[in-house]
A protein has these predicted regions:
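Eukaryotic intrinsically disordered, low-complexity regulatory linkers and tails enriched in Ser/Thr/Pro
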Residues: 1-75
Length: 75
């Protein structure tokens, strides 16, 4: 898996995903065309950068995460 450093954080390449969905108890957050993802062990939060350059912060507490890969199974 390809990685890169941004602002002192290591981001993983998740550009093979068409979308990524984080489900919470009362809502869900869907990110189209995610490109890079960082997980913070201390906070439990995720930072996701999408194809349009929008940064998303997903706090701890989500119940379920799912995504669809562009080229079939990718883990």
């Amino acid at each position: 898996m390809k990685t890169k450093e941004i602002a002192g954080m290591t981001f993983k390449d998740i550009s093979s995903e068409e979308y990524r969905v984080y489900q919470f108890a009362d809502m869900e957050v869907r990110i189209e065309k995610p490109q890079w993802m960082n997980f913070n062990i201390k906070s439990g939060g995720y930072r996701v950068l999408d194809v349009d350059g929008i940064s998303h912060y997903i706090p701890t507490g989500w119940r379920h995460l799912y995504w669809k890969s562009e080229n079939g199974f990718v883990f």
